[in-house]
Amino acid sequence: MNQDRIKDRILRRALRLWGYNELESENSFDPIVGLLLSAIASELERLGFALESSNSRMIERILELLFPENISGVHPAYSLVQVEPQDDNPSLSLYDSFKTTKNIVNIFNPSENTLKDIYFSPTIETQLHKAKVEYIAFGNDLNKIESYFFTERIGRANRPLKSGELWLGIRCFKEKNIENLQFYIDINNSYQKEFFFYHLKQAKIYFGDKEMQFEEGYNVELKNIDLEGIISKNYHYLSQIYSEINDFYKPYFFTLKEKISLAEQTEKPIIFRENFPEHQLSDAEDIIWLKLEFSEMLTSEVFQNVSFNLNCFPIVNIKNTRLFRRMSGKLDIVSIQSDDHFLDLDYVKNDEGDRLDLKNDNQRINVVLRRGGVARFDQRNASELLQYLLELIKDESAAFSSIGGDMTRETLRSIQQNVAALEQLSKEKNFVQASNPYLVISSANGDTLSCDISYWLTTGEEGNDIKPGTNLEIDNSKSLSFSKAVMLKSSFGGRKSLSVQDKILEYRSSMLSRGRIVTAADIKNFGNKHFKQTISGIEIKKGTKKEVSNKGGFTRTIDIYITRNQSSQPPLSETEWQYLCDSFLLYLEKNSANIYPYRLINK
């Protein structure tokens, strides 16, 4: 309620109490009455604003207590990378680091750009090979794969290959024996995607006359449920992120389980005896040829959109940072200062290498991670108080100006200019969201010890939209050496901490569905929470679709129709939109109680 309306209501109430007609004007009374009413109305208006601010802070604090950090906190971006290792049979480490540089545009000054280092690390400790898929043959064509983005035809068959037959030529640079060969397989036609991957799982793969075991997934075992970590670790947010990313990319990875060797390839493959008899590749001795037999329904029109790649793995926008501190006394506080966002604690070790952050009843040293305030209900930190001070000075400038005098006016003008500059700086630095975490280390005996503190940082949404084909610099790899690292997909999925409005939406969704997705209303509720302002409507209907298999008929489906909001801010790229759609369907398949398949249809 604004000041004029409050003043009008007070005046009408006063007229009734004084026995006057309510239609009497304010000018009918002494001017002091109008001044008093204006002063009271102004203070009541300010009281109303203060009450609304108090309610808002209470709601925000309650939501912060209700939601854990993995729901409301910052989330890193992720992508895929392909490397060319220089060693034989190397294994990745989660601490390997890749770096690129991104140009960050200052929205307050578009002519001023900032170069920021964006770091990525693997999400899985997969095994790599010093090998490369260099040739692919199907139909009438023999193609050379220059890179993930470019393929060149180098031969034409005298007699076309059988329908549904595809050959891969893998160049082995040093390795004579290859085991657990992991392929990343992708198709750049969304309409053929479901059709191709269904038949890929039914395909047979041969090395010579021997049929090989070809399975979906990575060449290392995934630990989706780490029981030991759940029991002993206090902080495992990053493990959940690893699991989420690995599950997202798992359908695109296939592993050749058995060992293959160049020594077993004693004669020319049949492809060079019957289809390309005069091609020079028939004499190459460092290429292993694999034959894949698909259904005859897969023709060259499908195969020309398919790519097979080695030495690919998911990466996530995180950077490992270590801090060494010497502690003394029974209580010590270590602040974690960084320009990037704190994501998760890795470990805290003493001089002997013992983990201090693990749960252990016999341990006399406790380590607790705190974020923001120290468990107070009123958690207004310095940044919030500064924002309040800025608003207060601006609101009270009129009261100071009543003192009069040139000196006073100049002083107030200087204060206002400084406040405006400080406010602009706080917006540019995103100071309102500053919340530096810190470690509270307590010791029962107060002994002096040295601590090795390792933690993970991320740039959040700034890690999004790193373009495909970007060359990554090897920043930190103690056990591996790479000659090249190239990003295959745009990075996406990074976000900043949820706003109060987003937290309210999350809370409402949790209260309505209670974490279950059973009814159409649950699906619609989850869709609104997942897509947020990027869609303008969602509708759930029953439908049918033709099965992909040859012998299958029609099956029932649950069709989800979404209307994309073209005016959403900030605008989404096609890669980010596709990620939202794919992750939405993946979550429904894993958490929904419905037995019918889902179809997502854009209106």
What are the residue ranges of the model-derived segments?
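Intrinsically disordered, low-complexity, polar/charged repeat-rich segments
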Residues: 1-603
